[in-house]
A protein has these predicted regions:
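C-terminus-biased signal that marks the final domain/tail of proteins
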Residues: 1-224
Length: 224
């Protein structure tokens, strides 16, 4: 557990910055590489559901930057448009863009690196809330809608020949809109999360919050 050895410092940081190697009393050592690493451009998990039609069954769970502090969002493989936050040319690894997923995930990750044991749990909770909702109800609901549309088209497509035209363009459009819309909305949520981290953990302090997420004020805050 790299959060517990001496290299983790006082904030249980599981990363070891470069250079990875060092010498001590004539012996050479090298730090292990964390499984989730800061040196990540993008990462994904492919999901193939054999019980669904091809146009519906393929999903790529796609994320950017450090896998420990970033989320994966579902992209149906039939999607024919790219979300703006993932668009090629919207910034790159050496050019900042405020509308790029890679860069907002970097902002969140680099905030956490300073006080990992205190800040990362807030990010992990946000990741779990989004991914569990998508893997639980949201994607299943979208699957049902797409499958219903697919089944309504299929009989006519089979009568006239499946190869005679793009019969399922409307299904693809539906799933593209879901993929793009979900990715962009979650990007915006991550922009808000980075702002929350700045306020909640400003100047080495942890601001208390009410049950609704708003910040608590002292009785002396009036007029300040």
């Amino acid at each position: 557990d790299m959060t517990t050895d001496i290299g983790a410092g006082g904030n249980a940081l599981p990363y070891r910055w470069r250079p990875m190697g060092f010498e001590y009393k004539g012996w050479s050592y090298v730090n292990e590489r964390a499984i989730a690493t800061q040196q990540t451009g993008f990462w994904f998990v492919g999901q193939s559901r054999h019980d669904l039609p091809d146009v519906v069954g393929g999903v790529i769970w796609f994320g950017t930057d450090d896998a420990a502090t970033s989320y994966v969002t579902p992209i149906y493989t039939c999607t024919d448009k790219v979300p703006e936050c993932f668009r090629v040319g919207n910034g790159n690894m050496l050019k900042y863009s405020p509308t790029a997923s890679f860069w907002i995930n970097n902002r969140v990750a680099n905030a956490c690196y300073k006080a990992y044991n205190i800040m990362a749990p807030t990010v992990k909770e946000a990741i779990d809330n989004f991914e569990n909702e998508q893997m639980g109800s949201k994607l299943a609901e979208m699957d049902r809608k797409a499958l219903k549309a697919y089944n309504a088209i299929l009989p006519k497509a089979e009568r006239k020949g499946l190869d005679s035209k793009d019969w399922f363009a409307s299904v693809r459009k539906m799933l593209t809109e879901y993929s793009v819309g979900t990715a962009q909305k979650q990007f915006e949520n991550w922009v808000a999360l980075e702002e929350l981290l700045l306020v909640k953990f400003i100047d080495g302090n942890v601001k208390a919050q009410n049950a609704d997420g708003s910040f608590k004020h002292s009785k002396w805050h009036e007029g300040t």
